[in-house]
Swiss-Prot record:
Organism: Haloarcula marismortui (strain ATCC 43049 / DSM 3752 / JCM 8966 / VKM B-1809)
Bilayer disposition of the protein: Multi-pass membrane protein
Primary role: Photoattractant rhodopsin.
Location of the protein in the cell: Membrane
Family per record: Belongs to the archaeal/bacterial/fungal opsin family.
Name of the protein described by the UniProt record: Sensory rhodopsin I
Subunit structure and binding partners: Interacts with Htr1.
């Protein structure tokens, strides 16, 4: 087993921890109206973990010309990254239209990126440019649109800011890694880029779901207020 496969295996195990964290979150929010929605957070580390197991065995990885397309990496991204930004919008109290809008922009960013990987010449860079435009639009949602919807609740504001900055800062790195790698300018090797992506994916998703667990009082507090009880007690 080569170094990349070992790293992929470790990453998959890390995502199993993320699934467990969501399980603890779900158990701690018994009776909350938001519990069923937040259960969908398990898809983020769950889909990512399954994808990395597939990547360990080379499933879905194909060579097109001189380019290696890791299919499950992009399948993971097209499913989980819209959920990452969608749940940020949910935390902000954004409208369904805004949430679906940011999720669609994210998915289109990933799909254009896949096209840029397999294309060549001018088309490659045109598709990279399209992906970059959608990428910039995500920052517009995170830093301009969603903040307008956040309720005047210090705990909700705190969680929203934490999620927004966590995702926003990490996602600056992804296009830079792509540019440096074999699909872009070729400054970095396939091995280096693969390991970097695995690190970024794990760092982006497992702490993300942990933040929901650590700040679960946001959702427990909402439950107490809706029931008319103004006494705020920590979630179990």
């Amino acid at each position: 087993m080569d170094a990349v496969s070992v790293v992929y295996g470790i990453t998959a195990a890390g995502f199993a921890v993320g699934v467990a964290i969501v399980g603890f979150l779900y158990a701690s929010l018994e009776g909350s109206d938001e519990r069923p929605i937040l259960a969908a957070l398990a898809l983020i580390p769950g889909v990512a973990g399954i994808s990395y197991v597939a990547m360990v065995f080379g499933i879905g990885t194909v060579t097109i010309g001189e380019t290696t397309l890791v299919g499950f990496r992009y399948l993971d991204w097209v499913v989980t990254t819209p959920l990452l930004v969608g749940f940020i919008g949910y935390t902000a109290g954004a409208s369904r239209r805004a949430i679906f809008g940011v999720m669609a922009a994210d998915a289109l960013m990933i799909l254009a990126g896949v096209g840029a990987v397999v294309a060549a010449g001018t088309l490659k860079w045109a598709l990279f440019g399209v992906s970059a435009v959608f990428h910039i639009s995500l920052f517009a949602y995170l830093y301009l649109i969603f903040p307008r919807s956040v309720p005047d609740d210090p705990q909700r504001i705190g969680l929203f800011s934490l999620l927004k900055n966590h995702v926003g800062l990490l996602w600056i790195a992804y296009p830079l890694v792509w540019l440096a790698g074999p699909e872009g300018l070729g400054f970095a090797t396939y091995v280096g880029v693969s390991i970097t992506y695995a690190f970024l994916d794990l760092l982006a998703k497992v702490p993300y779901v942990y933040f929901f667990y650590a700040r679960r009082q946001v959702f427990a507090t909402k439950l107490l207020r809706d029931s008319g009880d103004t006494t705020v007690t920590p979630a179990d």
